[in-house]
Regions:
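Structural element of the ATP-grasp superfamily
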Residues: 1, 39, 65, 144-146
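Core catalytic loop region at the nicotinamide-binding pocket of NAD(P)H-dependent oxidoreductases
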Residues: 71-72, 94-105
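C-terminal "lid/loop" region of Rossmann-like NAD(P)-dependent oxidoreductases
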Residues: 74-76, 102-103, 111-118, 122-142
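Amphipathic terminal alpha-helices
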Residues: 120, 155-158
């Protein structure tokens, strides 16, 4: 796809991930970083942060584990949780824009795992202190999207 877009001067929007900020940690993060490097100059790389939804989520994702009461521990991490509907509106904002480059797609407001678990009735779980390979905090820089008129509307704690 990148080759076609480059050869035909077609703008391409593609999914990246906040994991690129520590791209050396795992194969997924490496693959997203490679995509960003290989992307054509007139493309838009969207670094999605912690995407969630009440309706659809992988069973191994924290939000789903809290929702289904299958989580066995909590961490002290803070995550930038962004609802899938806000992802859709961010993409809809980017499509007609002339923006090119890579940008963060998140709320810019990290929420602690403990606060989320407490809201969902799971705050009683033990805290796991040792979590190698996990970032303490993820937080999107939303300035570029906000300058295009986009703002997230769904708060995970509401």
């Amino acid at each position: 796809i990148f080759d076609y877009c480059r050869d035909n001067n077609v703008r391409c929007l593609y999914a990246s991930s906040a994991s690129v900020y520590e791209w050396w940690i795992n194969a997924y993060a490496i693959s997203k970083k490679v995509n960003e490097i290989q992307a054509p100059p007139n493309s838009v790389g969207m670094r999605f942060f912690n995407v969630w939804s009440e309706k659809v989520s992988r069973s191994d994702m924290l939000y789903r584990m809290l929702e289904e009461r299958t989580a066995t521990y909590l961490t002290r991490h803070k995550r930038d949780w962004i609802h899938v509907n806000d992802i859709v509106t961010a993409i809809a904002t980017l499509i007609p824009s002339s923006y090119t480059g890579v940008l963060d797609v998140g709320t810019g407001n990290p929420v602690s795992v403990i606060d989320l678990a407490t809201k969902m009735g799971m705050g009683h779980l033990p805290i796991k202190e040792d979590t190698p390979g996990e970032r303490d905090i993820t937080c999107a820089d939303t300035l570029q999207l906000r300058e295009l008129g986009w703002i997230p509307t769904i708060d995970i704690l509401d």
